[in-house]
């Protein structure tokens, strides 16, 4: 990154986010569509915040009632003020920039950077390079070269390679449309020169709009300096206009995220099937297996084994844990714990160190202590389980009575038999046991054995009498006959001896 000669305290940034985004064909405002776990607007504002400008303004127009709360939330998240300017009528990018300038203090005399809310991969290094190139020029524009320039404004240069103007796609001649160097839509301006040029913009073009790009030609006519900074990596300045482009940039962002984790010491077995959001952290020597999605603010420690076919959203995984074929959200998995396969961790789950949640276990709002095992086929909801306990297969924590959710408390070193039902609210004391098939409706004292099932009673011949002719009845009759023959044979042998 080139060091900037412009202090961030002399810089204001305008983020243009007023457009309707009709090509998205969506009821969601375009800049609120997400990739990598952030909205496009969030990507833009996170990048700008790293440059630390003195002033930051977001220009809103279409759907501003829905976007403004997102801006407010991002201001809180970033810990800095963000002003909002309103473009009541969408009269073009030049008009949007004018609306943004109106939100700046009248005595501000520094550099104004104008960028867009739909350029999600733009990074702080590129913005810093723009400012370093700009110096004392009237304008500096980021450009890039693309294979297919359709839809972009073309960069026109003199024989001496000086930028003379930017011509939009709709207004370009056939020869101009063949130019592959395009406007990236990110600029640095001297604020005095920009204000003067904006007052002279005209809408006599194909779209009848006030183009911000037209200020470049005005600067040149006034004899002012115009500079360009070429961005070799065109993805950094690519915009999103439809869902195809959103998916393409999402895949490119994911590729970069996965590569960064690999270079930091994480093994990703199949990068093509692995999705990692931008705010996810992963420790060294962790293995990420195919089909894994790590979303939101998930935190994975070192030496973990995650996947295959696992989705974790806002989950913290301790060092050395194993998580296999699991879907989890807003949960905590302790160090050295094992989860899966086919485990569902709902919000509020906290599994202690060296604990286990096995096959076909579902948990919700439950704290499970260190070393405790819930091996298989169990629902644990609204519960607190102590350390080093074992919950038998097919157990159910009956937490809902039709009106309210109630909690179950299980102590430490408890052993529960298979198919135990805990009807909340109920407490099982430390060291207690429950028999298989027990329904726990009352508290169990520490060290007690709880058994609720009565004595088993066998009704002989019930199937033959009640289901005559059925396959079960025929099988029972055959088995009874064979048993009778065996008994007779045994009797004859006894008589013969």
Swiss-Prot record:
Per the UniProt record, the lineage of the source organism begins with:
Bacteria, Bacillati, Actinomycetota, Actinomycetes, Mycobacteriales
Q: Which cofactor does it need?
A: Mg(2+)
Q: Which residues form the active site?
A: 376 (proton acceptor)
Q: Which Gene3D superfamilies match?
A: Hexapeptide repeat proteins (2.160.10.10), Spore Coat Polysaccharide Biosynthesis Protein SpsA, Chain A (3.90.550.10)
**What residues bind Mg(2+), as annotated?**
118, 241
Record region (Linker):
244-264
**Reaction catalyzed:** alpha-D-glucosamine 1-phosphate + acetyl-CoA = N-acetyl-alpha-D-glucosamine 1-phosphate + CoA + H(+); N-acetyl-alpha-D-glucosamine 1-phosphate + UTP + H(+) = UDP-N-acetyl-alpha-D-glucosamine + diphosphate
Q: Does the keyword Nucleotidyltransferase apply?
A: yes
The name on file for this protein is: Bifunctional protein GlmU
Q: In which pathway is this protein known to take part?
A: Nucleotide-sugar biosynthesis; UDP-N-acetyl-alpha-D-glucosamine biosynthesis; N-acetyl-alpha-D-glucosamine 1-phosphate from alpha-D-glucosamine 6-phosphate (route II): step 2/2; Nucleotide-sugar biosynthesis; UDP-N-acetyl-alpha-D-glucosamine biosynthesis; UDP-N-acetyl-alpha-D-glucosamine from N-acetyl-alpha-D-glucosamine 1-phosphate: step 1/1; Bacterial outer membrane biogenesis; LPS lipid A biosynthesis
Name the gene that codes for it.
glmU
Q: Where in the cell is it found?
A: Cytoplasm
- Which InterPro entries does this chain map to? Bifunctional_GlmU (IPR005882), GlmU-like (IPR050065), GlmU_C_LbH (IPR038009), Hexapep (IPR001451), MobA-like_NTP_Trfase (IPR025877), Nucleotide-diphossugar_trans (IPR029044), Trimer_LpxA-like_sf (IPR011004)
Q: Where is this region: Disordered?
A: 473-497
Native organism: Mycobacterium sp. (strain KMS)
């Amino acid at each position: 990154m080139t060091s900037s000669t412009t202090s961030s305290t002399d810089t204001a940034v305008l983020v243009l986010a007023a457009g309707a985004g009709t090509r998205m064909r969506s009821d969601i405002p375009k800049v609120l569509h997400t990739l990598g776990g952030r909205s496009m607007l969030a990507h833009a504002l996170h990048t700008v915040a790293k440059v630390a400008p003195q002033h930051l303004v977001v220009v809103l127009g279409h759907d501003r009632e829905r976007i403004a709360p997102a801006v407010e939330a991002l201001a809180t998240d970033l810990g800095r003020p963000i002003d909002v300017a309103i473009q009541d009528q969408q009269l073009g990018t030049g008009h949007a920039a004018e609306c943004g300038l109106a939100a700046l203090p009248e005595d501000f005399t520094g550099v104004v950077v104008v960028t867009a809310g739909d350029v999600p991969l733009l990074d702080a290094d590129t913005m810093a390079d723009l400012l370093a190139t700009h110096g004392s020029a009237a304008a500096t524009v980021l450009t890039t070269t693309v294979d297919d320039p359709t839809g972009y404004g073309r960069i026109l240069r003199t024989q001496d390679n000086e930028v003379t103007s930017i011509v939009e796609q709709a207004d370009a001649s056939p020869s101009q449309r063949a130019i592959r160097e395009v406007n990236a839509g990110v600029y640095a301006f001297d604020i005095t020169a920009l204000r003067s040029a904006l007052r002279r913009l005209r809408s006599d073009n194909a779209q009848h709009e006030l183009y911000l790009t037209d200020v470049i030609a005005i600067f040149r006519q006034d004899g002012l300096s115009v500079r360009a900074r070429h961005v070799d990596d065109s993805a950094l300045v690519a915009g999103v206009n439809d869902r195809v482009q959103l998916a393409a940039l999402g895949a490119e962002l994911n590729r970069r995220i996965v590569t960064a984790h690999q270079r930091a010491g994480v093994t990703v077995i199949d990068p093509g099937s692995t999705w990692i959001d931008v705010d996810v952290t992963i420790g060294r020597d962790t293995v990420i297996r195919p089909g894994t999605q790590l979303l939101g603010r998930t935190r994975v420690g070192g030496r973990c084994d995650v996947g295959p076919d696992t989705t974790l959203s806002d989950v913290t995984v301790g060092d050395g844990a194993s998580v296999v074929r699991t879907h989890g959200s807003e949960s905590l998995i302790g160090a050295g714990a094992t989860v899966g396969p086919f485990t569902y961790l709902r919000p509020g789950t906290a599994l202690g160190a060296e604990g286990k949640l096995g096959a076909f276990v579902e948990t919700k709002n439950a704290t499970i202590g260190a070393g405790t095992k819930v091996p298989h086929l169990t629902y644990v909801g609204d519960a607190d389980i102590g350390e080093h306990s074992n919950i038998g297969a097919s157990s159910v924590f009956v937490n809902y009575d039709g009106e309210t959710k109630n909690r179950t408390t299980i102590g430490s070193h408890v052993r529960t038999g298979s198919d135990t039902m805990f009807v909340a609210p109920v407490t099982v004391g430390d060291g207690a046991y429950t028999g298989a098939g027990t329904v726990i409706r009352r508290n169990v004292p520490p060290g007690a054995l709880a058994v609720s099932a009565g004595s088993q009673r066998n009704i002989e011949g019930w199937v033959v009498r009640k289901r005559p002719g059925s396959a079960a009845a025929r099988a029972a009759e055959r088995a009874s006959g064979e048993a009778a023959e065996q008994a007779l044979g045994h009797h004859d042998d006894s008589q013969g001896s």
